[in-house]
A protein has these predicted regions:
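Active-site core segments that coordinate phosphate-bearing ligands/cofactors
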Residues: 1-157, 161-261
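Intrinsic disorder/low-complexity segments
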Residues: 263-265
Length: 266
């Protein structure tokens, strides 16, 4: 709640994308959002924040750094490489369910790349990971949209908010303006606002936000990218649903254990 307040998300019509290890999407409403897969928290000004969770948000890029570059590339180098690839990663999709899904029906979901071809290189994979997190988050955002007022804009926070490329991808995928705050320490700012209201420094939470939170940059949806990402999402959704029956079979396969020497040729 403090992070939401410290990023300026405190009244109906505003949404939040908080991407750290996970990605939490929150839509502020005047009432709780009663839906499976949606949790609610009570905000400081008597509003409610309905939120969804994608377990592997920023953690997907952390995995990509470890698995695809053996930790040799910095996150900024990965982002620079991804920026060289066109939207859609030339037909490569990534489902980012590296650790399953805590708040979904299928907690044993798995991650996968789909559409790999010989032409694809590291930059394509990095771009696909960024886009895959955004597309998976769009699935969650649609749950919120079905039960809440359509947000006018979304404010980004967390480590993921430091990447202009990722924010532009998300703006086009969500089809929402995505705002980047000047101060990225949103949780600390939110706590300061609460303290300021408590001691009378601010007359209201709204005044506290207006005096401490400012927008650095706005990322607006690109119409051509948004149309292309919509087609990508339709395929993403098919992959997500059609893969679900296979996860139990994969659980059985992965439950077999072998000693290390059994995999070594004699």
């Amino acid at each position: 709640a403090a992070t939401l307040l410290g990023s300026g998300v405190y009244q109906a019509g505003i949404a939040s994308d908080s991407t750290g290890t996970s990605t939490l999407l929150t839509v502020v409403s005047e009432h709780p959002l009663l839906s499976a897969g949606v949790n609610n928290l009570h905000l400081a000004n008597s509003a409610w924040g309905g939120f969804t969770l994608l377990d592997a948000g920023g953690d997907a890029m952390r995995w990509a750094r470890s698995a695809l570059s053996a930790g040799q590339l910095s996150h900024q180098q990965m982002l620079d490489m991804a920026a060289e690839v066109p939207p859609g990663a030339e037909g490569l999709l990534f489902l980012p369910y590296l650790t399953g899904e805590r708040l979904a029906e299928h907690t044993n979901s798995r991650a996968q790349f789909f559409g790999l071809q010989r032409k694809h290189r590291q930059p394509h994979l990095y771009r696909a990971v960024l886009e895959g997190v955004a597309l998976a988050s769009l699935r969650n955002l649609q749950q919120l949209r079905r039960h809440a007022q359509e947000p006018e804009a979304m404010i980004a926070s967390g480590g993921g908010a430091r990447s202009p490329l990722w924010l532009q991808i998300k703006a086009s995928v969500y089809n929402l303006p995505l705002l980047q705050t000047r101060n990225q320490e949103n949780g600390t700012t939110g706590c300061a606002i609460v303290a300021g209201v408590g001691v009378g420094l601010f007359s209201s939470f709204a005044q506290g936000v207006s005096r401490t939170v400012s927008i650095e940059r706005e990322f607006t949806p690109d119409p051509r990218q948004q149309e292309h990402y919509l087609r990508c999402f339709e395929l993403f959704e098919q992959l997500y649903r059609q893969a679900q029956p296979l996860y139990e079979q994969l659980d059985v396969i992965s439950s077999f254990s072998f000693s290390p020497d059994e995999g070594t040729p004699q």
